[in-house]
Amino acid sequence: MKRILPLILALVAGMAQADSNSDYRAGSDFAHQIKGQGSSSIQGFKPQESIPGYNANPDETKYYGGVTAGGDGGLKNDGTTEWATGETGKTITESFMNKPKDILSPDAPFIQTGRDVVNRADSIVGNTGQQCSAQEISRSEYTNYTCERDLQVEQYCTRTARMELQGSTTWETRTLEYEMSQLPAREVNGQYVVSITSPVTGEIVDAHYSWSRTYLQKSVPMTITVLGTPLSWNAKYSADASFTPVQKTLTAGVAFTSSHPVRVGNTKFKRHTAMKLRLVVRVKKASYTPYVVWSESCPFSKELGKLTKTECTEAGGNRTLVKDGQSYSMYQSCWAYRDTYVTQSADKGTCQTYTDNPACTLVSHQCAFYSEEGACLHEYATYSCESKTSGKVMVCGGDVFCLDGECDKAQSGKSNDFAEAVSQLAALAAAGKDVAALNGVDVRAFTGQAKFCKKAAAGYSNCCKDSGWGQDIGLAKCSSDEKALAKAKSNKLTVSVGEFCSKKVLGVCLEKKRSYCQFDSKLAQIVQQQGRNGQLRISFGSAKHPDCRGITVDELQKIQFNRLDFTNFYEDLMNNQKIPDSGVLTQKVKEQIADQLKQAGQ
């Protein structure tokens, strides 16, 4: 028996060296030739037209539990029973038990070749050899992942200051007296004109004039015009009287006039004739103090946001108001401000994994929906993540031999053909299951449900958060449905539809809600978002009224499944696959070899 064991090992090594590389290359070439044929040929295939005697519901359908079934149901039990009791099983068992034993001769040529391979193993597959060299090769592969996240939204309030006056007003009388002959006069168009600048502003409540008789003995009549009022003057007579002026008011700094002719007959005046004018003016007396009034403009409820920045938009300094001819001035350090509020904080959402991975880079992003004010609230982001594959090869002359199972991946790249094919088949199977369950005229597949969450006026109570639920105390106010929706979002079962104001008072929004379409599986979410919306451009409705209807059969046939990205489904697929443990396989091979050696020694 000890002599036979090296022979068996030599046999295995010889066969592995001689055939592994050629068989592997042949299989790899064949796989690349038929790549993609399965998924393209299955689309639009009608089995009843191509398969004679096709039956859509054979008896064997009782063993099929759907793509989500955990096992094969009764198929295993029925198979075991048939093997033990059926004629076919009995025949196979008897043939196996009565089969003559194979006696291996130590002198067989293939055993001798195997021994030779064992003796030269290090030079064949090791890192040594006269004409061979071991090399490391590596390859980078980039995979795109799409995720969703909230963006930070900033809104602004403005505060503007204006200067106003406060105080009281009283009235007093002022008496103004003038002697016209003592004032400078100018000759204008044959008239002597005296201009008098008023020192006050007010209403003339009494006007009085007077003059004395002159030295002239003859009568010299003329007209003196004062404040627009004509007065009759004569050199032979004196006068002392009141009059009602045409001009009723005086303005500080503004002149009024008195005038008469330069020559009357043969008499020529050298200046304005003597005349006293007395005016009693009612003047307003005010006592004012300047102060500042602030006005604010805010298109949203400040309770919905957090103040992050305040900046001055109109520089400070002195400003002046003039009232009743009097100037009032005051100083302000800033006359207008702009306050910045964050009304929505950024949330990494389902992008957390990729933003934390240094091998992932943001390649594109697109706004999913906007606020009523036009700000982007939510976006779809695409990250490209790099993964490196390395392997060890032996280069002998012009031939390259793979020393481990990774070198072909490093040379040609890892392929997701299997995962992609299984995902497409699973999507079609799931759609078929939905259709079969309805049996109606208006058949739909992958139907979802409209879900809502609220963003309360308290600011910190955001029940629409995509992450950080365990650390936010404000989330205690969220309902169980909102918490379930958050779980569905983390499992990538939702499609974001929009956001709207659900409670508004006096034009200010106090509460907002966000709407989603929630589906039962990742496959449904992928087909709905990428197929229905992405390819067919069918909307999910408005924020207030989401349209989460299923996909019709006609729409399903128009979707190109080979263009759908099933990356999110791959994770579940790979996590749920059952691959035998390598240690178990090794032990099983050892047991089989031991059994063969025992039989050979008998």
From Swiss-Prot:
- Cite the effect that the entry attributes to residue 90 to T: 90% conjugation efficiency
Consequence of substituting residue 517 to S: 0.4% conjugation efficiency
| GO CC annotations, alphabetized | cell outer membrane
Modification note: Has higher gel mobility under non-reducing conditions, suggesting it has disulfide bonds; a dsbA deletion mutant has considerably less TraN that is still localized in the outer membrane.
Look up what happens after changing residue 548 to S.
Answer: 0.1% conjugation efficiency
Q: What is its main location?
A: membrane
Q: How does the record describe its quaternary structure? A: Interacts with OmpA of recipient cells. Might form multimers. May interact with TraG.
Protein name (database record): Mating pair stabilization protein TraN
UniProt lineage: Bacteria, Pseudomonadati, Pseudomonadota, Gammaproteobacteria, Enterobacterales
